Amino acid sequence: MKTLIRKFSRTAITVVLVILAFIAIFNAWVYYTESPWTRDARFSADVVAIAPDVSGLITQVNVHDNQLVKKGQVLFTIDQPRYQKALEEAQADVAYYQVLAQEKRQEAGRRNRLGVQAMSREEIDQANNVLQTVLHQLAKAQATRDLAKLDLERTVIRAPVDGWVTNLNVYTGEFITRGSTAVALVKQNSFYVLAYMEETKLEGVRPGYRAEITPLGSNKVLKGTVDSVAAGVTNASSTRDDKGMATIDSNLEWVRLAQRVPVRIRLDNQQENIWPAGTTATVVVTGKQDRDESQDSFFRKMAHRLREFG
């Protein structure tokens, strides 16, 4: 009888342990497959494309690639003598028309005072018209001078924000044209994460929810908050023909690939450029609060590690 009870107890304990293990593994599997997470996430940052507003030869480059610069710091300089001469020419035109306008103003004033008793109405009107023409030319010359002054100022290209110089492709002696991108400036303290979540997991993603970010190849877990969810993505299976009619690609009803939607995550602490914009990471949305690691089971910890490195 004791042998039978002992055997039954061992069997019952084994069954209970198997059931508990199955439940733990099942919960870990559900946690792994159904909770909001993705390995398709990238660090991003605000990038300022810097292009000169004037054309000319580059006479000096003051920075090097990947250098951290401050707002207002000189990046490079474009040939200034040409624009200095243009400003001097414009200033000379302004001085000339100022003198001419003064002469024509005196002439028109004298004729208006004398009136039709001393000369014809046509001569008076002609003097007034000449004055207006000269005043117009003066205003135009002043505008040209101001533009020349602005062009001269813009031969010195400065950093509009604090950030890192990236992909510097200008060198002393090169000719650069107006509007051509010369430097990409990665704005400091603007890093965030774009996580491309499957549409099936968006129900567990809301602005304000907490998130964990694990950079690829790193054991460090960063904290962040869901900032926003994209309002729409492109429908790749629908286009329009040349007559505006909808064209829908054929697909298999039993094969439906979940669309990925960008989710923007704001980092709690800016990581400078330790993980540059464009590098990948794993993102897990933990809900309204951060995950309490002390409450995780062994299987959940395994599932979490699989997400990060699997």
From Swiss-Prot:
<keyword id="KW-1133">Transmembrane helix</keyword>
<feature type="transmembrane region" description="Helical">
    <location>
        <begin position="12"/>
        <end position="32"/>
    </location>
</feature>
<dbReference type="InterPro" id="IPR022871">
    <property type="entry name" value="PHBA_efflux_pump_AaeA"/>
</dbReference>
<keyword id="KW-0813">Transport</keyword>
<dbReference type="InterPro" id="IPR032317">
    <property type="entry name" value="CusB_D23"/>
</dbReference>
<dbReference type="InterPro" id="IPR043602">
    <property type="entry name" value="CusB-like_dom_1"/>
</dbReference>
<keyword id="KW-1003">Cell membrane</keyword>
<keyword id="KW-0812">Transmembrane</keyword>
<protein>
    <recommendedName>
        <fullName>p-hydroxybenzoic acid efflux pump subunit AaeA</fullName>
    </recommendedName>
</protein>
<comment type="similarity">
    <text>Belongs to the membrane fusion protein (MFP) (TC 8.A.1) family.</text>
</comment>
<dbReference type="Pfam" id="PF00529">
    <property type="entry name" value="CusB_dom_1"/>
</dbReference>
<dbReference type="InterPro" id="IPR006143">
    <property type="entry name" value="RND_pump_MFP"/>
</dbReference>
<dbReference type="GO" id="GO:0022857">
    <property type="term" value="F:transmembrane transporter activity"/>
</dbReference>
<keyword id="KW-0472">Membrane</keyword>
<dbReference type="GO" id="GO:0005886">
    <property type="term" value="C:plasma membrane"/>
</dbReference>
<dbReference type="InterPro" id="IPR050393">
    <property type="entry name" value="MFP_Efflux_Pump"/>
</dbReference>
<keyword id="KW-0997">Cell inner membrane</keyword>
<comment type="function">
    <text>Forms an efflux pump with AaeB.</text>
</comment>
<dbReference type="Pfam" id="PF16576">
    <property type="entry name" value="HlyD_D23"/>
</dbReference>
